[in-house]
Amino acid sequence: MRPRWIKVFHDLWDNKARTLLVVFSIAVGVFSIGVIAGAYQIISNDMSISYAANQPANVELRTVGFNQDVLGSIQNTHGVLDAEARRVFNMRVRVAGTEKWTTLDMVAFEDFEANTVNLLTALQGDVIPKKREVVLERDALNHVDVQVGNVLEFQLQDGSTKTMPVVGVVQDTAMGAGDFLASPYAYVSMSSLQYLRQPELFNRAYVTVETGGDDIRHIRVIGADLKDKLEKNGTRVIRTRFSETYEHPLASTVNAILGILMALGILIVFLSSSLIANTLSALLNQHLRHIGVIKLVGGRRRQIFEMQIGHFKQRSKT
């Protein structure tokens, strides 16, 4: 090995701390950009695909209460592909024999087998509860220490309690998407409402559109038509919610977070470049006398330049 390259490796060894600092700064910057870019591609694509696979509703109508006839009029509205009605109400629940109460949003289905909007994915046990049975959404298990086969106590408005067994666990990626403050969900049949002292009326309508499932303007037009139609028939609409089929409600939030992380990764790369420049400047100042000796014994400018570039390359490879 030529003497000048021996000197390069000797300098690297003598400045181990600076060498490692440069290497780690470059590695962190490149790694962060690679990971964030990969995460962006995976999350942005898979999140939307999995969301769309559950046939999410494009329009959600929250009302004071309606019956099967009103649902039929919604289904027959021009531009509507499908519509389902449910009753949603909240109750305090606890595992039988314990003291801790947890609030759950109860969702009552008319027909679980005919479910075509906001599909439920079975995870454990039965996905179709019978009369006086309940199925929990997966997130509810983080709030209620219960397993399939256990019994839950439900507190009614007058303070009395009713019990129902947990017969299954499902995943619902569509209904609570985008609502950070939503309570965990539990699912019962409409035949259980009288047992829970709830009126056997729907208060939510979930609608999918025939065309333009990714056109939010078209979806809003259909939603406005449905709202006008219901209110003209005497059904007061409290709130409407719109969402596209292939865009998760949290997609913009996730993309914004990933964008911030990407900017931080790029900033790290720029900061590491500044660190490298300062380190090389300090090394050159240390080597002024060495460079003078090299030139004194016949070293050319090109050779000195190659030494410093080689010094930098070795730091980068290390």
Name these PLM-found stretches.
Residues M1, W5-F9, D14-F270, R315:
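Membrane transport/envelope proteins' first extracytoplasmic loop
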Residues W13-N15, S274-K313:
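Interfacial "coupling" helices/loops that link adjacent transmembrane helices in transporter permeases
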